[in-house]
Amino acid sequence: IVMNFDAEKVKNDIVEWIKDWFNENGKGCKGVLGISGGKDSSVVAALLVEALGKENVVGVLMPNGEQFDIDVSKDLVEFLGIKSVTINIKDAFNGFMNEFKSNNVELSTQAITKDTIAAAISISIITSLNWSKNL
């Protein structure tokens, strides 16, 4: 059991750390992050908005084809008032899967294999957008 946990202090410390990091490493840059609508990306997005201002945060929505819960991500972006970009990763994902198949590569049937491929695509997208000239 954690005693005397001060959530407000922890949040403020994180916000200050984000400000310091951007001042030292990316002054004038925007925070670009993937928005899934889940707890993790929602909390990080809110912390970035508090630290950098909503005009300096860009949310990236990356559905893999049709995503039944994409509205949760859109609602978060709207609530925070941040700019967003939606990049559908379906074609890239299917391209990888087709290349594996055409080369007779049998992937594990575990969902984690497909999740790993989708995550790698997402990281590439966010990294590329991080260098964008017009976001």
Regions found by a protein language model. Give the residues of each.
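ATP-dependent adenylation/nucleotidyltransferase module used to activate substrates
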Residues: 1-135
